[in-house]
Amino acid sequence: MHTLPVKTGTRPLAQVQKLIPGLLLSAALAGVAILLGRSQWLQHNGISALTLAIVLGILVGNTLYPRIAAGSAAGVGFSKQILLRAGIILYGLRLTFQDIAGVGLHGVLLDALMLASTFGLACLLGTRLFGLDRTTTLLIGAGSSICGAAAVMATEPVVRGRAEQVAVAVSTVVVFGTLGIFLYPALFQLDQDWGLLPRDPGTWGVYIGATVHEVAQVVAAGRSIGIEAADTAVIAKMVRVMMLAPFLILLSAWLARDKAHRRQHSGATKITIPWFAVGFVLVAGLNSLVSLPPALVSHVNDLDTFLLAMAMAGLGLGTHLSAIRRAGLKPLLLAALLFAWLVLGGGFLTRLALA
């Protein structure tokens, strides 16, 4: 009687081993990005670890990575898909529902109006004026209207964008968000004579938080005006970030209905609920209702930054510069018009809401 050897757990172990090279590469790039992100100069200019991670990923992805891609692709894919979702869920720990009270009803309405109008304008201009594909348009719109690179990354699973489409959207956020760091303090000084907005730093903080792309960029722009402006700007920005989850759910439902219309209702269309967005809200709710130890929150936020940086590095590794060049100037022009709306339209609506 012959007995066959039992290889219990061999296949799962082999699958895990396939992930290790890509995970180590993504983790190494994320670690370097986080260390570089601690530079005072980079922090002052609002350049976050997430931005640095995708830049490093693109540099390595277009030089050394093609030689090792075969052995690393599985882990890199895991980083930009699974770890991304985990990072978005943990991002909720940075927020509390009490933040909403910090900006008041008018501030919340301003955030919601800027989100809806900016995203709607992106959809209109991107596909009709510039003739961009819808996925790139939606990603640029999400990044401009909510919270920059994190919003682009969170929207990608819903719209199923390609790596180069995500990279193009993130690059527009970096360009115009960085420009905003220098523009808003200059506008604040000019407005001391013009008087278009109330001169108090708190109002300018809400204006900045409701219109600047990235959280790091909001902090940098607000601090250039003053501590009060920076604190208010961060609260207004966090309220805007909190709108990410309902935005993703509504976007998923809208895309499902749109597909059904294009297929002339030929079959049942499933609305995909982005469960990581639900997890984001649940974690924010937990943070609002339960007083968690500050040390624990700090460590989890550090872990979250690392996971998101790994996801951004993974995205960069899969991005080909030739594909970005083929996209041309149209994505940048769309982002420029959205930035103009955020600055001008946002200032007008801030005056109406808070004056």
UniProtKB/Swiss-Prot annotation:
Q: Does the keyword Zinc apply?
A: no
Q: Which residues cross the membrane?
A: 20-37, 44-66, 71-93, 100-122, 137-159, 166-188, 233-255, 275-297, 307-324, 331-353
Q: Name one GO cellular component term.
A: plasma membrane
Query: Source organism's superkingdom?
Result: Bacteria
Keywords recorded for this protein, A-Z: Cell membrane, Membrane, Transmembrane, Transmembrane helix
Bilayer topology annotation? Multi-pass membrane protein
Keyword Repeat set for record: no
Q: Name one Pfam family in it.
A: Cons_hypoth698
Q: Where does this one sit in the cell?
A: Cell membrane
Entry similarity comment: Belongs to the UPF0324 family.
NCBIfam families on file: YeiH family putative sulfate export transporter
Specify the protein name. UPF0324 membrane protein PA5383
Q: What is the lineage of its organism?
A: Bacteria, Pseudomonadati, Pseudomonadota, Gammaproteobacteria, Pseudomonadales
